[in-house]
Amino acid sequence: MKKSSKTNWINMNEVSGFLLYSAYFAWKRKIEGTLLPHDLTHVQFILLMTLGFLKKDKAYVSQNDLAKFLCFDVTMTSQVLRALEKRGLLKRSQKEGDERSKFSELTDAGLAKIQGAAKDLLKAEESFFVSLGENKQGFDEHLRGILQQ
């Protein structure tokens, strides 16, 4: 890592963490702009999509299941799910005998909402990562490797 000779500062364009941070926020701006017409935040979209994904293999998906899978704070997850429930995009219930756990399920309106938003999101993702070209698969592999550390 080079330091500027005049200031003895680290060149931020050579710091991987800073580059990742900057790229993440550029990507996030694009995704949030894409989801805005669907009246969803990125966190809301991710929770709805993940709920649908996890529901394929489980009869019940709890708030804790969602939070753990996404590495989200449980309290924040509960607050966002409550807001989505008020909008009619999911319903929450309790399994008999387990009053502490809340289980969520997409409503038809929630499923329709994420299906429409997902199409636009995938187009935005493709547009954002187009500069990777043939390297996208390798890039994704590197990201998965980082996440497994």
Where are the regions a protein language model picked out?
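C-terminal regulatory/oligomerization modules of transcriptional regulators
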Residues: 1-9, 58, 134-149
